Amino acid sequence: MTKEQILAEHIIDAVGGIDNMDNIINCMTRVRIKVLDEDKIDYEQLKSIKGVMGVVKDDRVQVVVGPGTVNKVASHMSELSGAPLGETIKHKSKDYRANAEAQAQANKSEFQSKQKRGKFNKLLKTIANIFIPLIPAFIGAGLIGGIAAVLSNLLAAGQISGEWVTQLVTVFNVIKDGMLAYLAIFTGINAAKEFGATPGLGGVIGGTTLLTGLTDKNMITNIFTGEPLQPGQGGIIGVIFAVWLLSIIEKRLHKIVPNSIDIIVTPTITLFIIGLLTIFIFMPLAGFVSDGLVTVINGIIDIGGVFSGFIIGAFFLPLVMLGLHHMFTPIHIEMINQTGATYLLPIAAMAGAGQVGAALALWVRCRKNTTLRDTLKGALPVGFLGIGEPLIYGVTLPLGKPFITACIGGGIGGAVIGGIGHIGATAIGPSGISLLPLISDHMYLGYIAGLLVAYAGGFIFTYFFGTTKAMRESDTLGD
């Protein structure tokens, strides 16, 4: 074992073992441990450990081990505890070494499972882990922006007036832009966490793409086109790739840079290398990719119209079932960044609406099946609000046929949205009725029409073709 690993184990022993630790974090020089019972800490033993420079008693036990060393010690303590830094430790064993072995075995099984699923599914999980924590912010900022847009329209129409209303609109827009304008920074932070890099460095790389402080007189040139590089060019695709590369460089530097200068040298060199690559290489190239992707998808929706809408609406539910729908998250965000709205999301939302229609048909058609109806009582209300997993995994998928007819209903609703055209959403996250406040360009009626048609399509196809005699007459959730 390395001296840092030995130091980590001695610290764990002195603070009362893994069972007495709630979580672990670290700063530049200290490992900060939140303990469950302070009486179990042997402070004299802790201070006498070789490598411990000092101990500070606070709301956390702060063990000073020095710059550079602290990252390695905290990391090994995290591995032994079985919990990532900052997260609550699950106490499975009184012997932390046995706990570590059990965690290692669990990690091995998880790794083997990932290998079986393939790299593509691992990529989807990574995308989900980066963006799912941001969804509440998207929803909140999007709804506040929607309220600001409604108030602005009412002001322009003369239906309301007053300086306070104008100020309120300004404040709401500032709150909305607090999320959308700095999305690259949030993405960089979350990507760094996912890739095992320092979150702050990921945020800096995200902020670098905003080209803060540049004016028309001191623009940076795109080396591929000769034109000025635009703030945010390359979007989140470029940020994610840059932070992934940053994580590789930072980890390697931690291994080779001496502990005494690690805290200074590693972040400086990492940002220097990745910052230059981001500005001159990643932003221009990712800009080509993201611009092309958004153009192609919008073109497919515009040109395909009804047909494209049906295909997206019909096949989105199986993508959700397989977890593949997460691959659309960066696409939605890029569409919002470039055009102000994602025209893909309202069509995809029809998949959930078709499932709601199918569930309503099952409620009517299978009156004798009390088990099914009890399940629907809990799953159907949230289905209207766009939370479809209870219906997918609790009702339609186990029954088989209703899942297929729900997909058909979603396809019909998607065809309506595609046929009407230009129905977009200004933020991601909600679906179903919950998406209504986020619909752009006053296309609310078009979206409602799509929902109603999807409900009806799912209901009709399920009522006539989506049930069996066993479903209708049995008292179990099965066909």
Swiss-Prot record:
Domain spans labelled PTS EIIC type-1: 125-479
Active site: C27
Membrane topology: Multi-pass membrane protein
SUPFAM superfamilies the UniProt entry points to: Glucose permease domain IIB
Top-level taxonomic group: Bacteria
A cellular-component GO term for this protein: plasma membrane
Biological processes per GO annotation: peptidoglycan turnover; phosphoenolpyruvate-dependent sugar phosphotransferase system
Localization annotation: Cell membrane
Reactions that this protein is recorded to catalyse: N-acetyl-beta-D-muramate-(1->4)-N-acetyl-D-glucosamine(out) + N(pros)-phospho-L-histidyl-[protein] = 6-phospho-N-acetyl-beta-D-muramate-(1->4)-N-acetyl-D-glucosamine(in) + L-histidyl-[protein]
Gene Ontology MF terms: kinase activity; protein-N(PI)-phosphohistidine-sugar phosphotransferase activity; protein-phosphocysteine-N-acetylmuramate phosphotransferase system transporter activity
Keywords from the named record: Cell membrane, Kinase, Membrane, Phosphotransferase system, Sugar transport, Transferase, Transmembrane, Transmembrane helix, Transport
Pathway: Cell wall biogenesis; peptidoglycan recycling
Enzyme nomenclature, EC number: 2.7.1.-
Chain ranges passing through the membrane: 130-150, 169-189, 195-215, 229-249, 269-289, 303-323, 344-364, 379-399, 403-423, 445-465
Keyword DNA damage among record annotations: no
Residue ranges constituting the PTS EIIB type-1 domain according to the UniProt record: 5-87
Free-text comment about domains: The EIIB domain is phosphorylated by phospho-EIIA on a cysteinyl or histidyl residue, depending on the transported sugar. Then, it transfers the phosphoryl group to the sugar substrate concomitantly with the sugar uptake processed by the EIIC domain. The EIIC domain forms the PTS system translocation channel and contains the specific substrate-binding site.
Function: The phosphoenolpyruvate-dependent sugar phosphotransferase system (sugar PTS), a major carbohydrate active transport system, catalyzes the phosphorylation of incoming sugar substrates concomitantly with their translocation across the cell membrane. This system is involved in the uptake and phosphorylation of MurNAc-GlcNAc, the principle peptidoglycan turnover product of S.aureus, yielding cytoplasmic MurNAc 6P-GlcNAc.
Protein name listed in UniProt: PTS system MurNAc-GlcNAc-specific EIIBC component
